[in-house]
């Protein structure tokens, strides 16, 4: 299905717990560019460290549904949401411990389709997750349009972080942010190396 054929666009957000998904969404919801005339359905698949502001949700005509387990995320439930809300768009904050492939392989309601896939990463814990849950992260970023590393510090091995993504998904846009916002992309000419490929052997 092409984007022109999609009636209900899905904005899919993945990332491990406390990676900044909720913070990113809470900020986005109040931005002028986010506002549309129709209903937005926000499906939360885990409880993050940030609670969404009810006033912001009402102002942006955003309805929230919370799913507590992967078993609750079914084609039938999504069809029911489509019938009940008639959403103009859907945002899914996916649980970082669930395989992304489970959703990618799911039969979606008629004319629903993913138009943007974003992954958020807490740079301060990235290496720990890569050491322990590499396969989950690789699956998250394989089809991502954007990978956002937040809580970055200049003494972190950011070039290595970038290579870890590019070896899996060369087309993904990679953004590094610190507390002040986006860090200038100093890696524009940096090509991924065999080091990153070696790191991912066995995934």
Could you describe each region identified by the protein language model?
Residues 192-203:
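Single conserved hydrophobic/aromatic residue that forms the stacking wall/gate
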Residues 154-194:
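C-terminal accessory "lid"/substrate-recognition subdomains
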Residues 105-112, 123-168:
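Conserved C-terminal guanine-recognition region of P-loop GTPase G domains, centered on the G4
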Residues 116, 145-146, 199:
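Well-ordered beta-strand positions
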Residues 76, 127-130, 186:
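Short, charged, surface-exposed secondary-structure boundary motifs
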Residues 1-3:
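Pre-Walker A adenine-sensing motif
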Residues 5-14, 19, 23-116, 123:
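Nucleotide-state-sensitive switch-loop elements of NTP-binding domains
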């Amino acid at each position: 299905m092409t984007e022109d054929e999609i009636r209900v666009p899905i904005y899919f957000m993945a990332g491990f717990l406390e990676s900044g998904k909720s913070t990113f969404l809470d900020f986005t919801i109040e931005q002028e560019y986010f506002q549309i005339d129709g209903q937005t359905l926000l499906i939360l698949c885990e409880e993050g460290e940030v609670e969404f502001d009810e006033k912001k949700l009402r102002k942006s005509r955003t309805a929230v549904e919370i799913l507590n387990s992967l078993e609750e995320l079914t084609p039938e439930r999504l069809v029911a949401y489509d019938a009940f809300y008639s959403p103009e768009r859907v945002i899914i904050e996916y649980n970082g411990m669930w395989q992304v492939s489970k959703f990618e392989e799911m039969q979606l309601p008629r004319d629903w389709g993913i138009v943007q896939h974003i992954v958020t990463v807490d740079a301060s814990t990235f290496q720990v997750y890569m050491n322990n849950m590499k396969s989950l992260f690789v699956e998250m970023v394989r089809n991502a349009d954007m990978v956002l590393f937040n809580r970055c510090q200049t003494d972190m091995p950011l070039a290595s972080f970038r290579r870890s993504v590019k070896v899996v998904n060369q087309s993904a846009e990679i953004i590094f942010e610190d507390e002040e916002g986006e860090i200038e992309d100093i890696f524009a000419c940096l090509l991924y190396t065999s080091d990153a490929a070696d790191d991912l052997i066995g995934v």
